[in-house]
Amino acid sequence: MAVAPINMVRRVAEYALTEIPAEKISLGIPNYGYDWPLPYEQGVTKAETINNLQAIGIAIDHGVPIQFDETAMTPYFRYWQSGVQHEVWFEDVRSLKAKFDLIKELDLSGVGYWQIMNYFRANWLLLADMFEIKEGIL
């Protein structure tokens, strides 16, 4: 359960462009992940919201490899804790780059972040590398 799978983000953005001019659309970028206990039951299972560095730390602590879903363009992994399997989806440089590339491809006005308080240095380095920021806006 990716936070913002690029295939779905693309569909929403392309639909939005049929109704709204590109210069009025900013793409929302998640700056967090979810740690889901499994099995998932709709309406019952609740995920814990974690930041991207916490996600990486959990993978390291549990010695599990981080996988990458090529369709969603999103990293994820599974681990066990106290007899419960968990699945973690979060953002990394690869997933962020896919979203930034989409902004350029569709000529959108910029980005907005759902959660800016979770510092993820790689995001800001990539953002500065790919875009010119003027007067506090992208």
Feature-to-residue mapping (PLM):
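Active-site region of glycoside hydrolase catalytic domains
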Residues: 1-40
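Soluble non-cytosolic domains of exported or imported proteins
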Residues: 3-10, 90-97, 118
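Generic structural signal for well-ordered alpha-helices
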Residues: 9-17, 100, 124-131
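Short acidic/polar active-site loop segments enriched in Thr and Asp
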Residues: 23, 109, 114
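Conserved, mostly hydrophobic/aromatic
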Residues: 27, 103, 111
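Glycan-binding loop/region signatures in secreted carbohydrate-active enzymes
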Residues: 29-102, 128-138
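C-terminal functional modules
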Residues: 100, 114-116
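Acidic-and-aromatic substrate-binding clefts and catalytic sites of carbohydrate-active enzymes
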Residues: 116-122
